[in-house]
Amino acid sequence: MRSNNISNGDPVNFEELVWVNKTPNHEQILRSGDIVICMANGSSPLVGKASYYVDCGIESATVGAFCGIYRSDHPLTKWLFQSKHYKKHIQRCIQGGNGAIANIYPEDILAISFNIPCGYERVLNILNSLEEKYLLEQKLLSRYLGVKSYLLSRLFI
């Protein structure tokens, strides 16, 4: 996975994957629920963008040199990485930029602390339901665009 596979808050996309002839060690292999983070980029606004990994059956999937993996079993993790609190923290931590490659360090990610309110489970259920609906709508939109493209190609032969 590279930074172009990270879609701020959405699941990691699997378009334009790059394959290398190296076997990652066990800790580097992505697991369902892992957060994939852009740790360095020539474009400062892209540093810190994060997606969550959903296992799609790719054996030994891992991240490229400028990306990092955050792993937690807490069900709020993927939502925390989409919060304003996270984004503000990242903005304070970014090094470089202005022509140099901007970056953050693993310690910057580990230094983030969040207050988790009592009763968060209710909000978590709502967020998960909204996301499920959103992903379904995305799939439908993709199919609609495919039908549109097909019809247009047939119309103007």
State each model region's role.
Residues C56-W79:
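Short peripheral tails and domain-boundary helices/loops at the edges of structured domains
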Residues N115-I157:
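Amphipathic alpha-helical coiled-coil/heptad-repeat segments
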